[in-house]
């Protein structure tokens, strides 16, 4: 594997994503500038300037015309992906933690953090309704939680959303019936859910948690199907689009490393078999924990973002492409 | 290089000026596998540079939307940058090998290491005897075996101490024999005489190894006799011959052979 190493961020990465065709890579970090890159040669096209704090999440619409960023400066911004202009700004009283587009690209969901008297919230806004996209606009879906919502994701068209919480709880809401969650799973994880990613065909969810496991979930009822155990907190997990493989990335936080008796390390990305729940391969590269990762739609590339501020685009070689899992 | 080689046997070179001119012309060569090597010359601040670029042209079918996105204009921090990757943001990192923990035969390769790590991480109990992490020392199932081992170790230590002290029977006997053979007894010793004076007196005869003045256990006063050990028996004999009956202070010394105690 001859990886590309992209240095466009000054601080730790928080999210990398591919667009639908996989030719662009979107990344954001704890500095203020989300970036967009060509996946093929690692060329940076531009940065979206305007945020005033750490950018926690970025998402791109299906047609790669818009992208949305959630930031610690209490705003969610929607950008023109091609020109880098800010189209809309959504304000709130507390930092924004995650954001995502719906399947059609018309709805934007985001979660806000719990802070002093403000509860953690999950909101959805419609980009087509101009009254929702102005300063002081109201979301058409609004839900409050006592515990921090860490990640949110549209899991079925424009109707169902799944929210992961700091306590390990997972909840699924139907936007057409906003009162109560339609599915709840509180036993899948014991600690914070760090990442939720959908499989490319939309039939599975994978959740990564700080309890050193990642779980494969049924997208329709949040039932746990498989569990993948690691030796380190899992910060991100992704599913291969064309093979039964799972990739986990994680590692101890920098501030925790000196407090553990075990030597530091284990910053590799690990590849597991989806069905047999066993690790069969690993590759290293980052000097520090892996904070986020995404699998390319072609199945031959994985992008990882690390605590060291680098994005690595790893293209698999023949060893992996020719590998068959013997059981 | 190929051009230079081709030029060497060329008969039409008639002057050095023409040859130099040909060498300075930019040209392109094509390799067998489709790679192209482009050679160009540039002059910066009066210094001529030869720039060799090697690349490969690949035609790839992509969806139209992907082809359209290839024409995006740079914005933000990259405003005004030319097309192509920039060295400030993009570079090819070192080769990374993917490690397979299960080879094609399905064997687990890294299992032992991982198990150790896991045990270390999770267990707080530690056994001194078998170094395991799943129980305390008092509950060790192999305690009896390890205790026997410990007793054997203790015996070894004791033996070591004996050897270190030099308490072997052979060594002791040899030392005692030598000491008794070369020792003479001094009686009628004045009380005022101390060890230094005695050493001075007997040192004239030969090398003195040991001097022992007998003292009362309670009062600490000399008892009036002493033992002097010489290095060789000849010295002891000479001391007896010369120092017997000499007058020290107000007493007449009596120097004679030591009688064996056993």
Curated annotation (Swiss-Prot), chain A:
GO MF, one annotated term: translation initiation factor activity
One GO cellular component, as annotated: eukaryotic 43S preinitiation complex
Compartments in which it is found: Cytoplasm
Homology family: Belongs to the eIF-3 subunit I family.
Function: Component of the eukaryotic translation initiation factor 3 (eIF-3) complex, which is involved in protein synthesis of a specialized repertoire of mRNAs and, together with other initiation factors, stimulates binding of mRNA and methionyl-tRNAi to the 40S ribosome. The eIF-3 complex specifically targets and initiates translation of a subset of mRNAs involved in cell proliferation.
Origin superkingdom: Eukaryota
Known partners and oligomeric status: Component of the eukaryotic translation initiation factor 3 (eIF-3) complex.
Effect recorded for residue 252 to R: Represses the convulsive behavior due to cholinergic hyperexcitation caused by an acr-2 mutant
Primary localisation category: cytoplasm
InterPro entries according to UniProt: eIF3i, WD40/YVTN_repeat-like_dom_sf, WD40_repeat_dom_sf, WD40_rpt
Repeat positions for WD: 8-49, 51-89, 188-227, 229-268, 285-324
Residue intervals passing through the bilayer: none
Protein name: Eukaryotic translation initiation factor 3 subunit I
Gene: eif-3.I
Lineage of the species this protein comes from: Eukaryota, Metazoa, Ecdysozoa, Nematoda, Chromadorea
Keyword entries, A-Z: Cytoplasm, Initiation factor, Protein biosynthesis, Repeat, WD repeat
Organism, scientific name: Caenorhabditis elegans
One of the protein's GO biological processes: formation of cytoplasmic translation initiation complex
Stored SMART domains: WD40
Signal peptide stretch: none
PROSITE patterns, A to Z: WD_REPEATS_1, WD_REPEATS_2, WD_REPEATS_REGION
Curated annotation (Swiss-Prot), chain B:
InterPro entries: eIF3_g (IPR017334), eIF3g_N (IPR024675), eIF3G_RRM (IPR034240), Nucleotide-bd_a/b_plait_sf (IPR012677), RBD_domain_sf (IPR035979), RRM_dom (IPR000504)
Alphabetical list of Gene3D superfamilies matching this protein: 3.30.70.330
GO molecular function, one term: mRNA 5'-UTR binding
Main location (coarse class): cytoplasm
GO cellular component: cytoplasm; eukaryotic 43S preinitiation complex; eukaryotic 48S preinitiation complex; eukaryotic translation initiation factor 3 complex
Disruption phenotype: Abnormal morphology (dumpy phenotype), slow growth, sterile and in severe cases embryonic lethal.
Effect caused by changing residue 127 to Y: In ju1840; represses the convulsive behavior due to cholinergic hyperexcitation caused by an acr-2 mutant
Keyword line: Cytoplasm, Initiation factor, Protein biosynthesis, RNA-binding
Pfam families to which the protein is assigned, alphabetical: eIF3g (PF12353), RRM_1 (PF00076)
BP GO annotations: formation of cytoplasmic translation initiation complex; positive regulation of translation
Record-annotated RRM domain positions: 182-260
Keyword Nucleotidyltransferase: no
Location in the cell: Cytoplasm
Disulfide bonds: none
Subunit-structure text: Component of the eukaryotic translation initiation factor 3 (eIF-3) complex.
Protein family: Belongs to the eIF-3 subunit G family.
Function: RNA-binding component of the eukaryotic translation initiation factor 3 (eIF-3) complex, which is involved in protein synthesis of a specialized repertoire of mRNAs and, together with other initiation factors, stimulates binding of mRNA and methionyl-tRNAi to the 40S ribosome. The eIF-3 complex specifically targets and initiates translation of a subset of mRNAs involved in cell proliferation. This subunit can bind 18S rRNA.
PANTHER family, A to Z: EUKARYOTIC TRANSLATION INITIATION FACTOR 3 SUBUNIT G (PTHR10352)
Protein name as catalogued: Eukaryotic translation initiation factor 3 subunit G
Species annotation: Caenorhabditis elegans
Gene name, Swiss-Prot/TrEMBL: eif-3.G
């Amino acid at each position: 594997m001859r990886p590309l190493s992209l240095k466009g961020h000054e601080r730790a990465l928080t999210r990398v994503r591919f667009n639908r065709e996989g030719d662009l890579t979107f990344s954001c970090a704890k500095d203020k500038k989300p970036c967009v890159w060509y996946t093929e040669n690692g060329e940076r096209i531009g940065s979206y300037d305007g945020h005033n704090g750490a950018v926690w999440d970025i998402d791109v619409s299906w047609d790669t015309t818009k992208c949305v960023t959630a930031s610690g400066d209490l705003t969610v911004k929607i950008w023109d992906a091609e020109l880098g202009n800010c189209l809309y700004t959504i304000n709130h009283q507390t930092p924004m933690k995650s954001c995502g587009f719906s399947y059609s690209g018309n709805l934007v969901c985001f979660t806000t953090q719990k802070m002093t008297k403000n509860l953690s919230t999950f909101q959805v806004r419609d980009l087509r309704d101009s009254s929702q996209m102005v300063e002081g606009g109201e979301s058409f879906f609004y839900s409050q939680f006592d515990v921090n919502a860490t990640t949110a994701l549209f899991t079925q068209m424009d109707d169902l959303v799944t929210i992961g919480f700091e306590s390990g709880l997972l909840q699924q809401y139907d936007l057409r019936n906003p009162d109560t969650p339609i599915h709840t799973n509180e036993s899948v994880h014991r600690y914070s859910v760090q990442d939720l990613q959908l499989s490319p065909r939309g039939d599975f969810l994978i959740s990564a948690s700080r309890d050193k496991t990642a779980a494969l979930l049924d997208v329709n009822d949040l039932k746990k199907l498989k569990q993948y155990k690691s030796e380190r907190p899992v910060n991100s997990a992704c599913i291969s689009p064309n093979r039964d493989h799972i990739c986990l990335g994680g590692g101890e936080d920098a501030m925790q490393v000196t407090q553990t008796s075990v030597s530091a390390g284990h910053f590799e990305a690990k590849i597991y078999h989806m069905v047999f729940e066993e690790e069969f391969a690993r590759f290293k590269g980052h000097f520090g924990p892996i904070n986020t990762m995404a699998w390319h739609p072609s199945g031959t590339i994985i992008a990882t973002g690390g605590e060291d501020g680098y994005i690595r685009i790893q293209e698999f070689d023949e060893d992996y492409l020719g590998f068959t899992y013997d059981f | 290089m190929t051009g230079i080689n081709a030029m060497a046997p060329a008969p039409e070179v008639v002057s050095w000026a023409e040859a130099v001119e040909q060498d300075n012309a930019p040209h392109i060569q094509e390799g067998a596998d489709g790679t192209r090597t482009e050679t160009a010359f540039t002059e910066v601040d009066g210094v001529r540079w030869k720039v060799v670029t090697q690349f490969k042209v690949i035609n790839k079918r992509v969806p139209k939307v992907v082809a359209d996105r290839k024409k995006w204009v740079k914005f933000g921090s990259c405003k005004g940058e030319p097309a192509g990757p920039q060295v400030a943001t993009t570079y090819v990192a070192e080769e990374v090998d993917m490690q397979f923990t299960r080879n094609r035969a399905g064997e687990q390769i890294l299992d032992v290491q991982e198990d150790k790590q896991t045990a270390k991480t999770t267990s707080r109990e530690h056994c001194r005897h078998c170094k395991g992490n799943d129980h305390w020392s008092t509950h060790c199932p192999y305690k009896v075996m390890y205790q026997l081992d410990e007793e054997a170790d203790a015996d070894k230590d004791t033996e070591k101490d004996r050897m270190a002290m030099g308490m072997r029977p052979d060594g002791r006997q040899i030392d005692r024999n030598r000491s008794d053979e070369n020792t003479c007894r001094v009686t009628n010793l004045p009380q005022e005489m101390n060890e230094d004076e005695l050493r001075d007196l007997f040192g004239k005869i030969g090398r003195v190894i040991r001097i022992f003045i007998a003292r009362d256990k309670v009062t600490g006063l000399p008892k009036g006799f002493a033992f002097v050990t010489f290095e060789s028996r000849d010295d002891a004999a000479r001391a007896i011959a010369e120092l017997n009956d000499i007058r020290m202070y107000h007493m007449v010394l009596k120097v004679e052979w030591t009688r064996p105690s056993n």
